[in-house]
Amino acid sequence: MALRLEDKQAIVAEVNEAAKGALSAVVADSRGVTVGAMTGLRKAARENGVFVRVVRNTLARRAVQGTAFECLAETFTGPTLIAFSNEHPGAAARLLKDFAKGQAKFEVKGAAFEGMFIPAADIDRLAKLPTYEEALAQLMMTMKEASAGKFVRTLAALRDQKQDAA
């Protein structure tokens, strides 16, 4: 189906706007995925703050020009699904990685984070980033363990002093 120039410009503007506000992006090949599965993916994406769009390659290249995701231009071959994480850098990577487990034909092509290209083989690096809440919890656990360890060392030093004095 041929798109009019105005429609193409609207798509480029929409994807460019999503790219400018995004923390990371993931590109995938959705060839062979059923409509029902894609609908489920889009629903999960909305729930996780991820913008998902199937875009023509030339329009995708134009949309990411001048953004941190320009490094993805080489992955725009064949059917292209692009997902932008808006709330958490690893959200799109995690979502598409989990979706690919249930879809044999779904293939992640690559990702970008802070202007750096991440190959599909290394997508786990981005998917395993902790959320803000998880990072805070890890920080609190580290601080708690450090203070408990310091307390134990203080008690051990006090015990050693008393043993030396006796």
Swiss-Prot record:
Cellular component, GO annotation: large ribosomal subunit
Name the record gives this protein: Large ribosomal subunit protein uL10
Pfam families: Ribosomal_L10
UniProt record similarity statement: Belongs to the universal ribosomal protein uL10 family.
InterPro entries: Ribosomal_uL10, Ribosomal_uL10-like_sf, Ribosomal_uL10_bac, Ribosomal_uL10_bac_type, Ribosomal_uL10_CS_bac
GO molecular function, one term: structural constituent of ribosome
Job description of the protein: Forms part of the ribosomal stalk, playing a central role in the interaction of the ribosome with GTP-bound translation factors.
Keywords from the named record: Ribonucleoprotein, Ribosomal protein, RNA-binding, rRNA-binding
Protein origin, superkingdom: Bacteria
